[in-house]
Amino acid sequence: MAGHHRIKAGSEDASAAVDFAESVCGSAADGTAANAGDDLDFPFGVTTRQFGPHEGEAVAIAHGKPDGRGVSLGRGEVTSVDPDGALLVQREMHSDGVYDAIGTERRAGDVAITRFKEGRWWYRTRYRGADGDRRGTYVNVCTPVEAFPDAVRYVDLYVDVVRRPDGEVERVDDDELDAAVADGLVGTELAQRARSTATAIERAL
């Protein structure tokens, strides 16, 4: 079954559904499908339609770290789900401060609109004021994004790219990635993938 492991990881209901479908239709173990269990063909549209997340539901943003730590960036409302794997999540800021790396003022009532796409090595968050003013854009480089019914998950790869309201683009936190490689937390090939992804984003912004 295409996406076998990825679907089962979504929820207990999804896991049970996969077991049932494979018991009826056969699986790779039965030799009935050459690509059964291949998560490269994960059927995002069908899976989210059946198990979520759905528009109007809340999901957490689970920000993993290579050292094993996990940080929640809060919960947001799913405002759009596209069968091609794209997911829009909107959050409201509840405190004043400064946007990390962007440097602009953060005000309570600001809105963060994040676009995730299943399997992509980065995601983008645009910050806007309650009046619609642009506060800036933050692009996080990470391991391939996975959208589950209750959370969007990935592992942060340190290096990121920001775009400020005046159009200035800056790549940030290369030093943190270098340190993670030196500490053995991130392999050299993975680090190179992160750097090349950041370079492509920097050019595109």
Sequence positions of predicted segments:
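Acidic, polar-rich N-terminal leader regions of halophilic archaeal proteins
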Residues: M1-L205
